[in-house]
A protein has these predicted regions:
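Structured core elements
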Residues: 38, 63, 78, 177-180
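Glycine- and acidic-rich phosphate- and metal-coordinating loops
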Residues: 75-82, 113-119
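Alpha-helical support elements that line or immediately flank enzyme active sites
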Residues: 78-108
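Glycine-rich oxoanion-binding loops at beta->alpha junctions
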Residues: 47, 52-70, 158-172
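Glycine-rich, mobile lid/loop segments that gate access to catalytic sites or pores
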Residues: 97, 102-187
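N-terminal amphipathic/basic leader segments beginning at the initiator methionine
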Residues: 1-53
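Short, ordered loop/turn segments at secondary-structure junctions
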Residues: 44, 67, 82-84, 119-121
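Short active-site-adjacent helix-start/loop capping segments
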Residues: 47-49, 71-72, 85-88, 123-126
Length: 187
């Protein structure tokens, strides 16, 4: 696939963000030989906000996040690339619930503080074990967020994207850094 003409010449040097840990892992669910799971762990007391699709048919992870965001706190975000877990019915809900409960147990948080995202093909259910069996190894790879693992995380969430996307901003005079990765537009 050709690199998008919108691709920057290099990935931004996203700084370490205190209280954020990242990990990536190759589950092999869809892709061979590349990371397709991304885990973000946030320090206790982190607050979450969200904007969700207006689709009448959101994915199972979107339904989960709409439900748990009402609590206002977040400790983790788990994203898998390759399967959107959309139009998967009860099977998709089981993947979401199993993933949240398993991950919460591994890092000692409440399942309601686990946020999930999936990207990829639509309408292909998969068993919860395809994702859950990789969580212990993924958790074992957690490291403080730095320039290298921000890039690895941005690459792990890619599907048909031709380049990884990330950005950050320092809030003047506060020492605060807002950082993020994305996928999609300008792929």
């Amino acid at each position: 696939m050709a690199l998008s003409p919108l691709a920057p010449s290099e990935f931004p040097a996203i700084p370490n963000v205190q209280g954020v840990q990242l990990a990536v892992h190759a589950s092999g669910m869809r892709y061979s030989g590349r990371d397709d799971l991304c885990l973000v762990v946030l320090s206790s007391g982190s607050i979450v906000g969200g904007a969700f699709t207006q689709s009448l048919c959101p994915s199972a992870p979107v339904d989960w996040c709409k439900k748990v965001i009402k609590g206002g706190s977040a400790r983790t975000l788990l994203c898998n690339a390759g399967n959107a877990n959309a139009f998967t019915g009860k099977a998709g809900q089981e993947v979401v619930e199993s993933s949240a409960i398993s991950l919460a147990g591994l890092i000692d948080v409440n399942p309601e503080d686990v946020f999930l995202a999936s990207t990829g093909v639509i309408g292909e259910p998969f068993p919860p074990s395809d994702l859950v069996e990789h969580l212990p190894e993924l958790v074992g790879k957690l490291q403080e967020a730095d320039q290298d693992n921000w890039l690895a995380a941005a690459n792990a969430i890619r599907t048909t994207d031709t380049f990884p996307k990330g950005s950050f901003a320092k809030i003047n005079g506060t020492g605060a850094v807002v950082a993020g990765i994305a996928k999609g537009s300008g792929m």
